């Protein structure tokens, strides 16, 4: 079965530090949850078909396995269940467009259609915004100082837009149609600290010049259809550009597939969250900050098929990091840091 972008998520690890469970939605509207036990795949639950494809999956209470809620969109309907598959929400939004982007935080539901953004508080309309071009992705972050997180839209007209409720806080133009946006955060630097990612100002003269975060700014990641990945530093008044990964500057002109999946995790265990990038040409990349504030490529694989979702976690072994990838055709592929494996595990 085919999968849409961001329709695969890893559930948080429980207190017993058992392997993480995985949920994935397909083009029939089913959501499947499974885990691994003694090396065997074990189905936890499977929902009935939803009549339309699962457009997006979002988790609420994402830091707590016991309380996590699994939310997904099918057409204009949002449904939710608990980690055992018991459905507790079926909400027809009555929107004019199918929901392609979804984010859930506490009682807030943020939903992006083709051109229309809607926000619901306890399933009641609370905000509305019509974008100037297609909404490709949606994230949230507390930027404006308002009590509720602000919505961040990545749009086809090359703009990243930050909304406070129904109001546009500001927008900024990128160097390509924005296909992915993601919240990003590292631990704040200790007083007097130095090293990668610390300090606000200019990078070394040999590198492109860009702003650095000194802890005052909220950080976002964005990806574009023409292959760029970049950092944005945001506060209540404006958006500043941080580093940018450009396929041309990196000498990778032939490897500039559009960014479909963007995630981050400290897979190198150096205290900085590494960038995980999945592209529409099947390229999987990990970028690290080991050597300075500009990310460096440390891992790359070509899967020969468009990547729709990408997460890091512990699915088959709690002692070794894994990159879990979902492809357009519904394949799930795991890349493990376990020395003895050598090869990736794959599930259809």
Task: State where each predicted segment sits.
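Beta-propeller-forming repeat regions
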Residues: 1-348
